[in-house]
Amino acid sequence: PVGAGASDLRNETLRTLLREVRFAAIKGNSSEIRFLAGEKATARGVDADQGVLVSEDNLVASARMAAELSADTGAVVIVSGRIDIVAHAQKAWAVSNGDPLMTRITGSGCMTAVVVGCCVGAAPTELPQACLCATCAMGVAGEVASENMAAVGGGTGTYRSMLLDAMSTLDGPAITCRAKVKYIL
C-alpha cells in the first residue's frame, strides 16, 4: 500500500482492493498500515509519519493493531521500520534486524516487498513463517551490507549495491544465525 493515507486516489484504490482481493500478505510502513487498519495516520508521500514509528514504547500496541488488521483481512501483515512487526491472526513477532542506512536509500521497502512475495510464493502453506523469513532476510542483508561498506568506505550508492550483493549471497544458515525475532502476542 505505497503511500496509503497520502492521497484520496490512493486511499480509494486501496479500499477497493481490500474489498475485492484476498491478499496473502500486506506490507507497509507504520503510517500505511495504520491507515489500512482504520487508525488516524498521516504520510509524507511514501515515508512514514515519524510520530507513529514502531518503538519499544509502542511495540505491543503496534503489534495488536497489525494483528487486528491481519484478522480482518486474512493476510499476514508486515509493518516495516527500525523494528519490524509480522502479524498473523492474533499472533505477532518483532524483528530487530536491519541498519539505519536502509532508510537513506529509496526503495528498500519495495525490495522487502519483493522478498516477501518470493517467500510467500515459495511457501504458500506457511505464510507467517515465509513473511518472517523474508523480513529477517532483508534485515540481515542490510546489516551485512553495512559491515561490508564499512570495510571499503563509500556512501549510499555503495550501500545500495552492497545491499543487493548481500541479498544475492544470503543463505538460510546466515539468516538463522543472525535473525533477531521476538514473540510479542
Give, region by region, the residue ranges found by the protein language model.
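Glycine-rich nucleotide/cofactor/substrate-binding loop typically near the N-terminus or early
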Residues: P1-A6, A166, L170
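Short, small-residue alpha-helix embedded
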Residues: R104-C136
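Short, small-residue-enriched loops and turns at beta-alpha junctions
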Residues: V2-S7, I85, M102
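Short, well-structured alpha-helical segments that form the helix of a local strand-helix-strand
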Residues: M65-S70, L127-A141, R160-M167
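Short pre-catalytic strand/loop immediately N-terminal to key active-site residues, enriched for Gly-Thr
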Residues: V95-T106
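Conserved phosphate/ATP/ADP-binding segment of small-molecule kinases
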Residues: R10-A92
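Charged C-terminal helix
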Residues: V140-L185
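Electropositive phosphate-/nucleotide-binding environments in soluble metabolic enzymes
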Residues: S7-N11, S30, L59-A63, C110, ...
